[in-house]
């Protein structure tokens, strides 16, 4: 009976700690608009390039893509699957 009381006490204590921790957390304040510099905003010229011809990036990616390239695939050497032929 005593162990049930201790378990209930610890469960309630844990719940109280979680609730108090969540309630006492600081509220994040958003940065004011004055902290955003013009250099962080997108360039109007870039937007015109993207809107005018958005096919250049997929084209560049497709030029460098080779579906038969196996240079990064290396055979796995596993002593359990290799047979000793000597």
Swiss-Prot record:
Subunit structure: Interacts at the cell wall with secreted rep1 repellent peptides.
Biological source species: Mycosarcoma maydis
Compartments reported by the entry: Secreted; Secreted, Cell wall
Protein function: Core effector contributing to spore formation and tumor formation at the host plant. Modulates surface hydrophobicity promoting cell-cell or cell-surface contacts. Lep1 and rep1 interact in aerial hyphae to form a strong hydrophobic layer. Plays a crucial role in hyphal aggregation that might be a prerequisite for strong proliferation of diploid cells and for induction of the morphological changes associated with spore formation.
Membership in a protein family: Belongs to the lep1 family.
Outcome of gene disruption: Leads to attenuated hyphal aggregation, fails to undergo massive late proliferation and produces only a few spores in plant tumors, resulting in reduced virulence.
Descriptive protein name: Late effector protein 1
Protein keywords: Cell wall, Secreted, Signal, Virulence
Signal among keywords: yes
Chief localization: secreted
Signal peptide: 1-24
């Amino acid at each position: 009976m005593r162990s049930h009381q201790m378990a209930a006490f610890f469960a309630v204590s844990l719940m109280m700690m979680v609730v108090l921790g969540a309630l006492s957390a600081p509220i994040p304040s958003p940065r004011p608009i004055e902290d955003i510099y013009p250099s962080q905003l997108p360039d109007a010229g870039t937007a015109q390039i993207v809107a005018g011809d958005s096919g250049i990036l997929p084209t560049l990616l497709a030029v460098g893509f080779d579906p038969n390239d196996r240079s990064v695939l290396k055979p796995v050497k596993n002593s359990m699957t290799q047979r000793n032929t000597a």
